Amino acid sequence: MCEKKIDVPALFGKMVFGEQQMQQRLPAEVYRAWQRCRTQGTALDRSTAGEIAAVMKDWAIENGATHYTHWFQPMTGYTAEKHDSFITPDGAEGVRMELSAKELTKGEADASSFPSGGLRATFEARGYTAWDPTSYAFIKDGTLYIPTIFCSYSGQTLDKKTPLLRSIRELDRECVRILRLFGNTEVQHVTPQVGPEQEYFLIDREMYDLREDLKLCGRTLFGARPPKGQELDDHYYGAIKPRVAAFMRELDEELWKLGVLAKTEHNEVAPAQHEIAPIYSDANTACDKNQLTMELLKKIASRHGLVCLLHEKPFAGINGSGKHDNWSLQTDTGENLLKPGGTPSQNAQFLLFLAAFVKGVDEYQEMLRCCVSYPGNDHRLGGNEAPPAIISIFMGDELTAILDSIVQGTAYVDITKKKLKIGVDAMPEIPQDTTDRNRTSPLAFTGNKFEFRMLGSSQSIASPNVVLNTIMAEELGQFADRLEKAADFQSALQELLQETFTAHQRIIFNGNGYDDAWVAEAARRGLANLRDTVDCMPAYIDKKNIDLFTKHAVLTETEMRARYEIHLENYCKVTAIEAHTLLDMVTRCILPAAGKYADSLAQTLFHKKNCGISLPTVMEERTLTRVSEQSAALFRVCEDLQTALHNAPAADGGIDVARWYRAEIAARTQQAGELINQLETIVDTACWPYPTYADILFSV
């Protein structure tokens, strides 16, 4: 069968009201006003906003839209939307289609129904959405989607986009200050660029529908190890199965229509696991488009009789799914500030930005760990093919050797055996692509960017990039303050580089992060080892971290404490949901199935012993004993779990309550799951009520 021909350039961005559409359709002065708003942050007056709204509405209707929505990203980590039609009464028993300036720029939503950490009570319901003109509107399913921020009636942020935009602004300002010190007067803006590599699982819908835990929790709460997993490394980069390939083709087409630069797709390491990666874009747009990608992964999978699992650890014993956040800095003249240059001056600039990153990661390592901490990722980090929970930076041997020479004040011998004294006037040529890929590192320099590998597959990339942007802005600001006062810039820069790399070399680690020896070594270096969400959260409201975000006006102390409460409450609620789900599966299906099999064994044993012939009964006796003992042990653990849930304190009780949920609920849920795994390997397949890992992972 011939595949239909796709004109990709014509298809790309077809459903996006982007710069090209604006330039073609808006009056020149209105277009220039929008450009100033987008690049300089100048406000749009009502008249200009009204003209943009009218043109946007006409374009949307031409492309089949009948409704619009303010599309925002509340603290759930997902997106939210409320659809309104364009209709308005025309005064003659008919309607006309309109989108006013107010409807474009401002909306209202019930803020009390979203996570707010106490910022909004039920009786204080009003929240507002406001248009984000830096992210393009688009059409999906007959609705015009207008990207917006979300705040409370009193102006407190209730979303993930607002802090991201603020952090981008702060980073822009501090980067430009540094560039001016190097004599660069052309650059006006610097923007963080992000390319999120999205991992996911695809399984058959029929298998999914038979697993209550997958439907309610997004992951399996039990499952014995299958006879074959990922041991043969035969799935990674393997031939893509026809059903999956058809899904990927449709996914590409839908993403391209929405202006998403979907570039690379391949099979991942675990069976049924895959990855999609886009070309980089600015951090704000990348965040919006990753949310779209996750939504379309699920939606399009259902059209193919599949289910897309975005949970970080849907199956035990094989790789979980992450999201590698490739982060770099780009000027409005097209220069990548994390790319080594071809001249000593360019490399001095590169090393200064590198020093700021190293210093920031070391000083705020706990905050970086916090921004990727939530229940799903707790099951992944430190597991199969996932980074450890300890923050460190991989630099590669050659770049590390250059940094060592700076620290020691010695000559650096490059790969051509040429000796160079590290200085501003005699910087070494720093070759690209000399670093190997260290999959065990949570943060790796990969030639012209940093790859933050700790993100979970289901999370918004907003918070991790807020942290990266803000710590970088802080360190660059400190550097600029010092260098702007220097009488001799070159010697001051030399001193600053040596001082910074000396003070923070502990955060650089090029070894195997999976090795148990690294845990001991990290402790010796004084690096934090925060193993899970409950361990991480106190650092979220540490004075040092609150001071960082309030100083740069990214978040207020109240907003940070609210997010802290949201994370803790979410941890408790997710833990309780998983426990309730497991209890339901055990009491209604698993224990009855084990009992049915035990009864069958007992009957067989009885008949063998009473048939008048001496027959061996060792198999029935031992198996019956094992099934009975495991069932009794599972029953006891589930009784304890039920009692704990009955006595559980309210989920919004803070850190002590979260610790209680971890010790009393999560631990018992895990214990019960391990007992179920043992039962699964004993009980007759005909009696077992749920699909096994082998059934699920090899179903497509």
Predicted regions, residues:
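Active-site proximal loops enriched in glycine and acidic residues that flank catalytic Cys/His/Asp
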Residues: 48, 72, 100-101, 278, ...
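Composition- and surface-driven signal marking solvent-exposed, interaction-prone regions
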Residues: 214-215, 290, 312-313, 339-343, ...
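C-terminal amphipathic alpha-helical interaction region
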Residues: 500-700
